[in-house]
Amino acid sequence: MMKMKTLLTLLLVGVLVLAVGCQPADETPGEAAEEMGSVTLGYVSWDSEIASTNVLKVVLEDLGYDVDMMDVSAALLYQGVAEGDFDLTTAAWLPTTHGDYINQYGAGLDDLGPNLNGTRIGLVVPSFMDIDSIEDLATGEYAGTQITGIDPGAGIMQATEAAIDEYGLDYELLEGSDAAMAAALNDAISYDEEVIVTGWTPHWKFASYDLKYLEDPLGIYGSDEDIHTLARVGLEDDMPEVYAVASNFHWTPDDMAGVMVAISEGMGAEEAARQWVSENQDTVNGWLQ
């Protein structure tokens, strides 16, 4: 009987050893992501940045990284990357819109270059409005002498405050958010009412409504810009694969618009990003080289 008990004990020990030895093969996705490391992406809650940040998040997660997204103001975004609170951001509008933040925090930022070329900012109105230039706003009381803006501190808000001063406009700039601006635009167009909003491309509203930029003869809003990817200093050494993917990340305004339109039509941001990644594997594979 004792021999039988000893044999059973040895068999149990053997089974436990085998089970423990096989554990890495059954590693959970969470454990794998923990081994790869965690990445924190900072962004501002503008539709364009929601699209790009979610796409980069999906690509990095597919490589096995644990990715967090943090929504902050533009000022805190640059400060966060410079101080190492965020690893990356895809939301740097340069050289004009966010130029002041680069001047302030540039020493702590690693500029990986443009991820999207050919952006524009300015004042936008429905095409049915009988004005074509910011100068025209001074000749009448359009849209109740109100300009619907986004979050305070955004570069486009600073430029609009400058435009009001330089063009001598007696207009009020309303602070809000990207979503609130889009809602105000939709409501006004639905009732054929005048509205003036701070606008930028790429943005899904240009695919959904007939809009136009007001000409800016004084050049307050600058010329065409690019959206850059910024990394914290040291990321290249700490996470070379993440750094390489972020450096290669580049897409077109049409690519971004595809994600933004899907979100505006009710799809979740991450779902829209995953759909785009699935449908554009050739582009994504280029980022992974």
Labelled PLM ranges:
Residues A19-E31:
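Bacterial lipoprotein signal-peptidase II cleavage site
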Residues A32-S48, Y65-M70, G144-T148, A246:
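Short, well-ordered beta-strand elements
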Residues V44-D47, D68-G80, L173-A184:
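Short helix-initiation/N-cap motifs at beta->coil->alpha
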Residues T53, S73-A107, A183-A184, W204-D210:
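Pocket-flanking alpha-helical
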Residues V55-L63, E141-L173, S278:
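Ligand-binding cleft/hinge of the Venus flytrap
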Residues G106-G153:
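A conserved helix-loop-strand patch within extracytoplasmic ligand-binding domains
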Residues G108-L116, E194-H203, A207-G222:
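Short beta-strand->loop
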Residues R120-D130, E225-M239:
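A bilobed periplasmic-binding-protein/Venus flytrap-type ligand-binding module shared by bacterial periplasmic
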